[in-house]
């Protein structure tokens, strides 16, 4: 297989974890005979420094012409007072790619379960599906004076149906349960959300549907996370709840994410930020970035075996006791990546009977 991947290293630790992504991709090429054209483009704060814009037109054009996009990290205090903010580029990139579904799998490795703030961390295995294009972030009018500020929350039927359908399709391949999170006891947009969700559910009779109000959901994520399979919710609620869920793994450096469009390339990135305090120190945890690569291989390219090989190698390295500093170890970004690549090679040799 031959695919073109745009690599947006971005800011902070982004360039370091992007090298880890490239490392496992090169190993996949060598072990399975694929070829990936990796194209580096400027994005975020570094793009502001070079071009004045966080998302140069050249970068967006390259992303649109690709088969998938990998993003390292974006932002940092260096650009706090700048006219253009790096994070603005991420919103523009999502809009330009037309991605509507943000997908965050939340699982806990047995080797690092003790780092989770929850006692029964081994029961955690769910996915948060967040709607990305509608809701309060993108609705108008918006206005502010010294005395009053107004935001608008709007959702259209087709936006709800699209994201909920995606969640049901995903759940049908997992444990066959969808939890829809809303505030239907108060918000008109949530009442429509619930109505449309129930209509979509009729097309998936083998998938269980439950509704939970967002405040109760925030509590249940901590009290009983094992009850969840696929969570689907609107933009603002998803933004907050997915961040809450991410800490259950014990480190932000562990979890990947994907953002999908109806057609065209998807965007894959770790959920962690740019971590400017450790940037350039070879301390960043590359697991979330490598898992984002695994998601890309499986979800965009159909290379499930290759994606699983990365996941299995990561698990094996963790079980061997090798960890980066954020999860209680002494491995560097580089040494942990090399260990995963070596494990991939060894597992492939075992699979082929040496």
Swiss-Prot record:
Protein's GO biological process = L-leucine biosynthetic process
Compartment(s)? Cytoplasm
Annotated catalysed reactions? (2R,3S)-3-isopropylmalate + NAD(+) = 4-methyl-2-oxopentanoate + CO2 + NADH
Q: Which residues bind Mg(2+)?
A: 215, 239, 243
Which SUPFAM superfamilies does the UniProt entry name for this protein? Isocitrate/Isopropylmalate dehydrogenase-like
Q: Which InterPro entries match?
A: IsoCit/isopropylmalate_DH_CS, IsoPropMal-DH-like_dom, Isopropylmalate_DH
Annotated positions binding substrate: 94, 104, 130, 215
Enumerate the UniProt keywords alphabetically.
Amino-acid biosynthesis, Branched-chain amino acid biosynthesis, Cytoplasm, Leucine biosynthesis, Magnesium, Manganese, Metal-binding, NAD, Oxidoreductase
Co-factor note (free text):
Binds 1 Mg(2+) or Mn(2+) ion per subunit.
Q: Which cofactors is this protein said to need?
A: Mg(2+); Mn(2+)
- Binding locations of NAD(+): 76-87, 273-285
Family annotation (PROSITE patterns)? IDH_IMDH
* HAMAP family reported for this sequence: LeuB_type1
Question: What's this chain's function?
Answer: Catalyzes the oxidation of 3-carboxy-2-hydroxy-4-methylpentanoate (3-isopropylmalate) to 3-carboxy-4-methyl-2-oxopentanoate. The product decarboxylates to 4-methyl-2 oxopentanoate.
Protein name stated in the entry: 3-isopropylmalate dehydrogenase
Q: Name the species this protein comes from.
A: Bacillus thuringiensis subsp. konkukian (strain 97-27)
- Read off the lineage from the record: Bacteria, Bacillati, Bacillota, Bacilli, Bacillales
């Amino acid at each position: 297989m031959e695919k073109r991947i745009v690599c947006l290293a971005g800011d902070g630790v982004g360039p370091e974890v992007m090298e880890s992504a490239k490392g496992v991709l090169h190993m996949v090429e060598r072990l399975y005979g694929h070829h990936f054209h990796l194209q580096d483009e400027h994005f975020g704060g570094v793009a502001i420094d070079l071009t004045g814009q966080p998302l140069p037109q050249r970068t967006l054009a390259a992303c649109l012409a690709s088969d998938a996009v990998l993003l390292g990290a974006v932002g940092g205090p260096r650009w706090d007072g700048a006219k253009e903010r790096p994070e603005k580029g991420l919103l523009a990139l999502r809009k330009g790619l037309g991605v509507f579904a943000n997908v965050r799998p939340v699982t806990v490795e047995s080797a690092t379960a003790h780092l989770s703030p929850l006692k029964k961390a081994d029961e955690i295995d769910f996915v948060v599906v967040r709607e990305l294009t509608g809701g309060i972030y993108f609705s108008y009018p918006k206005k502010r004076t010294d005395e009053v500020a107004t935001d608008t929350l709007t959702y259209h039927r087709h936006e709800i149906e699209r994201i909920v359908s995606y969640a049901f399709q995903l759940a049908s391949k997992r444990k066959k349960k969808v939890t829809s999170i809303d505030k239907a006891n108060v918000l008109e947009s949530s009442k429509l959300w619930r109505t449309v969700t129930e209509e979509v559910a009729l097309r998936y009779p083998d998938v269980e549907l439950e509704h939970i109000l967002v405040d109760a959901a925030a509590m249940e994520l901590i009290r009983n996370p094992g009850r969840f399979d696929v969570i689907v919710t609107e933009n603002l609620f998803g933004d907050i709840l997915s961040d809450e869920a991410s800490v259950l793994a014990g480190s932000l450096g562990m979890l990947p994410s994907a953002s999908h469009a109806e057609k065209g390339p998807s965007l894959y990135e770790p959920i962690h930020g740019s971590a400017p305090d450790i940037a350039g120190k070879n301390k960043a945890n590359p697991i979330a970035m490598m898992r984002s690569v695994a998601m890309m291989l499986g979800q965009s390219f159909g290379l499930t075996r290759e994606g699983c090989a990365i996941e299995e190698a990561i698990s094996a390295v963790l079980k061997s006791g090798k960890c980066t500093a954020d999860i209680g170890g002494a491995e560097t970004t580089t040494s942990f990546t090399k260990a995963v690549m070596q494990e991939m090679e060894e597992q492939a040799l075992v699979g082929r009977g040496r």
